[in-house]
């Protein structure tokens, strides 16, 4: 992956695992819904690349969750 660089992405998101999770969820959203693009121009033509470009631009960020929250799949 040449653009955006991993170093640029690490400045926005604290861990590689959070970055992968965030980008994959955003890529899935872009694939399922039309006209959800947040940037005017993308370098990548693929959804994951577009999601990573949004992270590098600071448009897509990680929202911290309350650690005491229990989800259905954790029961």
UniProtKB/Swiss-Prot annotation:
Biological process per Gene Ontology, one example term: DNA-templated transcription
Reactions catalysed, as given in the entry: RNA(n) + a ribonucleoside 5'-triphosphate = RNA(n+1) + diphosphate
Residue ranges of coiled coil: none
Listed InterPro entries: DNA-dir_RNA_pol_omega, Pol_omega/Rpo6/RPB6, RPB6/omega-like_sf
Keyword Ligase on entry: no
Presence of the UniProt keyword Glycosyltransferase in the record: no
Broad EC category: transferase
GO MF annotations in UniProt: DNA binding; DNA-directed RNA polymerase activity
Keywords for the protein's UniProt record, in alphabetical order: DNA-directed RNA polymerase, Nucleotidyltransferase, Transcription, Transferase
GO cellular component terms, A-Z: DNA-directed RNA polymerase complex
Quaternary structure note: The RNAP catalytic core consists of 2 alpha, 1 beta, 1 beta' and 1 omega subunit. When a sigma factor is associated with the core the holoenzyme is formed, which can initiate transcription.
HAMAP family xrefs: RNApol_bact_RpoZ
UniProt xrefs under NCBIfam families: rpoZ
Function in brief: Promotes RNA polymerase assembly. Latches the N- and C-terminal regions of the beta' subunit thereby facilitating its interaction with the beta and alpha subunits.
Family of the protein in this entry: Belongs to the RNA polymerase subunit omega family.
Protein name: DNA-directed RNA polymerase subunit omega
Name of the gene this protein is made from: rpoZ
């Amino acid at each position: 992956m040449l653009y955006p660089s991993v170093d640029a992405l690490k400045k926005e998101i604290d861990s590689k695992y959070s970055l992968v999770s965030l980008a994959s969820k955003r890529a899935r959203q872009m694939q399922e819904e039309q006209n959800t693009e947040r940037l005017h121009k993308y370098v990548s033509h693929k959804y994951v690349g577009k999601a990573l470009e949004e992270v590098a631009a600071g448009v897509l960020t990680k929202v911290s969750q309350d650690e005491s929250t229990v989800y259905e799949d954790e029961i």
